[in-house]
C-alpha cells in the first residue's frame, strides 16, 4: 500500500467514532452482539460505471459486493452491518468519468453521516475533483487504481487536502514510478532512440505521459513531439500520419481506453512497425477486442 508522501496516517473523526463505538458495543458485559440489532455502517464507493471505463468499474464493484457480503455473513464486527453506497461518476455526455459528477458524489457521501469511509475513485481526474470535498468532510478514501501523484504530494496539500489531514490512500503505486519505468524499458531493453508522446487530456494520461517524457529525455531518447488527443474523437489519422512522417522508433500513449483503443487500432494500420507502449490504463479486454 502506498501512503501519502511525508505523512503519517491519522484517523478521521468518523473513523475514530466508529472504532470507539464498536469497541464499546463488543465490550459491554452480558450483551451478545450477534443477537443485538445490527447498527448500519455505510462505506461510500465511487466508480466510473458509465462510459469507456465501465468494465474495470464493474469488476471492482463485484469484488466489493462479495467482500462486504462475506464480512456481514461472518459478523466481521459483531453488532454492525456494512452497506455500500455505490455512486457512478461516469456520464453518457462525457463518455467516461465526469469530474463534476465525481464532486457531486463526494458531497453526497460527506452529507450522509452513516458513511464512515470511502472506496475509490477509479480515475485520477475524479480523484482531483473529490479529494478537497472529502478532506473538508473528514472522510478518508482508498483508491484501487487512481495513480496521479499530485493528489498525495505534500506540495499540493493546500489544494487537495485543505483540512490538513491526509485522507487519500492507494493500493497501487503512482505515475511517478510507472511512467519512468516504461521509459527505462524503452531505452534499456528495446533500445529506443526516438519517441513521439501522446496523451488523452485526462489527469491520469497527462500525468503519466509527463513522467514518461521526462525520464525518456533523461535516458537520452529524443522526443520528437507531444500532442493531446480528444478522447471523444473517432479518427486520429491526421496525428498518426504526422507521426509516420517523423519516423520515430516508438510511440508512447498516456491515457485510458476511451481514446486508447481507437488509437491502437489506427496506429497498427498507419505505423505498424513503430513500437507502441502505454500505461496500466490500457489494461482491458476492450483493447484486445477493439484494436
How would you label these PLM feature ranges?
Residues 1-9:
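Short, Lys/Arg-enriched N-terminal segments with co-localized hydrophobic residues
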Residues 38, 62-86, 218-221:
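Signal peptide-proximal N-terminal region
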Residues 55-59, 74-157, 229-236, 270:
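Beta-alpha junction/loop-to-helix N-cap segments that form part of ligand/metal-binding clefts
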Residues 56, 60-67, 98-106, 118, ...:
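Stable alpha-helical elements in mature extracytoplasmic
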Residues 115-225, 275-291:
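Extracytoplasmic ligand/sensor domains, especially the bilobed periplasmic-binding protein
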Amino acid at each position: 500500500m502506498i501512503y501519502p508522501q511525508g505523512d503519517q496516517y491519522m484517523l478521521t473523526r468518523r473513523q475514530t467514532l466508529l472504532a470507539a463505538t464498536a469497541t464499546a458495543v463488543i465490550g459491554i458485559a452480558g450483551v451478545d452482539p450477534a443477537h443485538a440489532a445490527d447498527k448500519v455502517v455505510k462505506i461510500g464507493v465511487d466508480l466510473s460505471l458509465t462510459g469507456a471505463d465501465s468494465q474495470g468499474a464493474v469488476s471492482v464493484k463485484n469484488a466489493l459486493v462479495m467482500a462486504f457480503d462475506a464480512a456481514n455473513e461472518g459478523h466481521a464486527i459483531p453488532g454492525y452491518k456494512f452497506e455500500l453506497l455505490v455512486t457512478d461518476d461516469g456520464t453518457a455526455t462525457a463518455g467516461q468519468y465526469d469530474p463534476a459528477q465525481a464532486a457531486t458524489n463526494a458531497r453526497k457521501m460527506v452529507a450522509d453521516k452513516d458513511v464512515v469511509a470511502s472506496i475509490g475513485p477509479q480515475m485520477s481526474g475524479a480523484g482531483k475533483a473529490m479529494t478537497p470535498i472529502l478532506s473538508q468532510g473528514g472522510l478518508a478514501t482508498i483508491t484501487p487504481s487512481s495513480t496521479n501523484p499530485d493528489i498525495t504530494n505534500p506540495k499540493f496539500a493546500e489544494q487537495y487536502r485543505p483540512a490538513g489531514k491526509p485522507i487519500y490512500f492507494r493500493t497501487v503505486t503512482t505515475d511517478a514510478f510507472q511512467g519512468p519505468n516504461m521509459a527505462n524499458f524503452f531505452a534499456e531493453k528495446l533500445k529506443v532512440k526516438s519517441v513521439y508522446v501522446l496523451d488523452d487530456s485526462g489527469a491520469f494520461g497527462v500525468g503519466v505521459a509527463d513522467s514518461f517524457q521526462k525520464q525518456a529525455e533523461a535516458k537520452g531518447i529524443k522526443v520528437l513531439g507531444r500532442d493531446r488527443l480528444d478522447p471523444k474523437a473517432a479518427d486520429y489519422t491526421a496525428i498518426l500520419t504526422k507521426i509516420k512522417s517523423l519516423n520515430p522508433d516508438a510511440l508512447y500513449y498516456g491515457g485510458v481506453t476511451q481514446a486508447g483503443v481507437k488509437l491502437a487500432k489506427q496506429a497498427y494500420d498507419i505505423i505498424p512497425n513503430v513500437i507502441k507502449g502505454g500505461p496500466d490504463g490500457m489494461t482491458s479486454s476492450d483493447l484486445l477486442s477493439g484494436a
